[in-house]
Amino acid sequence: MSEFNETKFSNNGTFFETEEPIVETKSISVYTPLIYVFILVVSLVMFASSYRKKQAKKISEQPSIFDENDAHDLYFQIKEMSENEKIHEKVLKAALLNRGAESVRRSLKLKELAPQINLLYKNGSIGEDYWKRFETEVKLIELEFKDTLQEAERLQPGWVQLFVMVCKEICFNQALSRRYQSILKRKEVCIKEWELKINNDGRLVN
């Protein structure tokens, strides 16, 4: 009787015995989740690095509001020459200092202009294009100066701190020199327009 109860019939009259499904279990290593997390982190880092490079390239392709950067071009010309010819390290360092000083000058100029640019933009006196161009220029100068610091560290490890100080001194000395030359030119213009007579000592002759 018990055997009959444990047997079931199908619709066509045949009978079959019930079978429980077999569940197959697989063991997973404890390192598997860690591997997935590691792959995810590496992928995110690679994506972030690629995104930053694309953004830097996009920024560098924007037109500059300054003139051509001769100090930048001169440094890379000397650096390229040093690969084929023997050029003294001091020459390369001097060119890099000049490049760094130009970056400092442009950075100070942009900081000086920033309040006026912000005010003009808020008042609607300048458009979105010029505003973005100004922001792009600020980022370009930051990238340029960071690159000079990396070059300074490559040329002489531990030179960065002194390099920054010397760049600022060069920048200020160049500013004084430009101001002095501007005064001399203004003096020549005034002498010519007013028909003044100046002796060798720089004094006015009656």
UniProtKB/Swiss-Prot annotation:
Annotated function: Acts as a component of the Sec62/63 complex which is involved in SRP-independent post-translational translocation across the endoplasmic reticulum (ER) and functions together with the Sec61 complex and KAR2 in a channel-forming translocon complex. A cycle of assembly and disassembly of Sec62/63 complex from SEC61 may govern the activity of the translocon. SEC66 is required to attach or retain SEC72 in the SEC63 complex. It is essential for growth at elevated temperatures.
Subunit structure and binding partners: Component of the heterotetrameric Sec62/63complex composed of SEC62, SEC63, SEC66 and SEC72. The Sec62/63 complex associates with the Sec61 complex to form the Sec complex. Part of a complex consisting of KAR2, SEC63, SEC66 and SEC72.
Pfam families named in the record: Sec66
Protein name, per record: Translocation protein SEC66
Keyword Protein transport carried by entry: yes
Residues that span the membrane, as ranges: 28-48
Cytoplasmic side: 49-206
GO cellular component: cell periphery; endoplasmic reticulum; endoplasmic reticulum membrane; rough endoplasmic reticulum membrane; Sec62/Sec63 complex; translocon complex
Subcellular location: Endoplasmic reticulum membrane
Keywords: Endoplasmic reticulum, Glycoprotein, Membrane, Protein transport, Signal-anchor, Transmembrane, Transmembrane helix, Transport
Family from the record: To S.pombe SpBC409.21.
Other known facts: Present with 7820 molecules/cell in log phase SD medium.
Membrane topology: Single-pass type II membrane protein
Domain of life: Eukaryota
InterPro entries: Sec66
